[in-house]
Amino acid sequence: LNELLQRIKRPGHRHYDAYLVLDADNILDPNFISEIEKVYSAGYEIVTCYRNSKNYGDNWISAGYALWFLREAQYLNNARMRLGSSCAVSGTGFLFSDEVLRECGGWNFFLLTEDIEFTIDNVVRGHKVGYAAGAVLYDEQPTSFAQSWRQRMRWSKGYLQVFRKYASRLFSGIAHGSFSCYDMTMNIMPAAVLTGTSIVVNVGAAIANATNGGSMAALGLSVLQTVLSLYMTLFVLGVITTVTEWRSIRCTGGKKVLYAFTFPVFMLTYVPIC
């Protein structure tokens, strides 16, 4: 992307007010450009879209990705937009102005999750990312677990890289009252830290239980309750998103219902990845 933008901005080439980033296999709703432009014209220098998927019904893996991105669009970015906070760029289907590009000194985002890096870099600069709910993009999701594992492993490493690079500036923004900085910090907080904390707490509880003469059956029941609680929490999130975005999901009704049940399993596979 950096090389392309440098070529576009060579002397003698046309000047562009903004740039739209898309993957070659993305399919756009007929009104995509006009909907993105509405938000851009409202004053947002960076705009992201409603990220849908064209292969939701392939299997539980593609559906897991797709449902997460629908939830991200409707219940994270849409909520942020309503609250006046900054939204977050996710993968593809986003616009940024030439002014933003100049402020950044070009596209200098080379971490494993450059979309998140770009978002955080602009949030700490004081920019807000807008969300165009009517700009619908259809993306293709992985269908094999091996491919999904490698991709999400890369994302997890990328989150760590971004957190390491921007943590101090995010915390400084939080100290100065920036809700967007707080929100983005929670968005990129390394899952490994949260998972590690959970493991330490549970191991500590197991040791305490054994020391005090507690039964292993009680410990096993406690672990089972924790897993079921996590499953039900994720299941509810998946069901709510499935119901509200029902008409946007491109697959049969039976698969929509089935994949609401497999969504928690997909999300729980993040634990060993992180």
Tell what function each PLM region has.
Residues 2-16, 30-112, 149, 153-164:
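Long helical/loop segments within the catalytic core of UDP-sugar-dependent glycosyltransferases
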Residues 19:
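Short aromatic/hydrophobic "clamp" motif used to bind/position activated sugar donors
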Residues 23-27, 110, 122:
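The conserved acidic donor/metal-binding loop of glycosyltransferases
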Residues 84, 119-137:
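Catalytic donor-sugar/metal-binding loop of nucleotide-sugar-dependent glycosyltransferases
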Residues 112-118:
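Acidic donor-binding loop at a coil-to-helix junction in glycosyltransferase catalytic cores
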Residues 133-147:
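Active-site donor/metal-binding and catalytic loop motifs
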Residues 149-187:
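Active-site-adjacent helix/loop segment of glycosyltransferases
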Residues 187-274:
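Membrane-embedded multi-pass helical conduit in multi-pass membrane proteins
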